[in-house]
């Protein structure tokens, strides 16, 4: 009996030690920046105006926004942009200016834990939950409704932004008039296992820490950026961009996998706007993210199963993940403009 107790105690101790070694934190190079309160600048770019503001989220976090719109012109619609992983709002300035010159207002925002949307409780690389990320986007939609009265809202999500954009539809599809996605992330069955592993890392290493095993398994923050685009100039810009994140903490990775896991949970979608026009634009060389032809068909089928009737998928040949930063980006810009002008 005594030996049995020793074995049990030893087993518990061994399990605890193994958990510590597996999920222990490693130092990370993310530096906390101070958030600046309220309005920053207003500039004029040819026939376009640009204004940087801070919108206060429900928990007090200042969300950094850039509003780009046509000067002295009526606004056709307002495009709400949700960026992808590791990046920031200013990477969409080129597309936003193009759309503004064509009559659209564009709201760029740094998702919390990215760019300038940070504070002591929300450091760089931290996304606390899917719900919180969606609440922020709903706050931005309300801001648009208040400042652009009677203008339709077009939601645009790139990469993980396309995941959040689809989850936004669950209860809020009646708030938008169109949905655009690029670098459209496929549903992956392994996401549910990723969530379990990440939750264990949260438990044993702490939500705000950086577990080496999570970093290894997720590969978020790889230094190889050639998969983004065929345009070497754009790849170099990413590598030299000090605003790009090196990775995510444990709760950030949990949120990423949890978002992907929910894409197939059809029961979560109310589908109050079944005729919502939805367009996905991807690159044929972006198979790892989109799942290629098989993954894109699955994405389209899922949206139609939910109840959306107008789902269009465009897969450009010889393009990679960031289609708006490809060598022939003009073709993509025009495709987006045509969709918004319909």
Regions found by a protein language model. Give the residues of each.
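Hydrophobic alpha-helical topogenic segments used for membrane insertion/localization
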Residues: 2-24
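N-terminal cap/lid segment of alpha/beta-hydrolase-fold proteins
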Residues: 34-70
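Active-site glycine-rich loops that stabilize anionic/oxyanionic intermediates
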Residues: 81-87, 159, 284-285
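Conserved alpha/beta-hydrolase
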Residues: 89, 96-121
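Alpha/beta-hydrolase active-site loop
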Residues: 126-145
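Alpha/beta-hydrolase-fold enzymes
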Residues: 163-248
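Short beta-strand/loop motif that positions the catalytic acidic residue
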Residues: 280-282
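Catalytic active-site module of serine/aspartate enzymes centered on a nucleophile-bearing elbow/loop
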Residues: 304-342
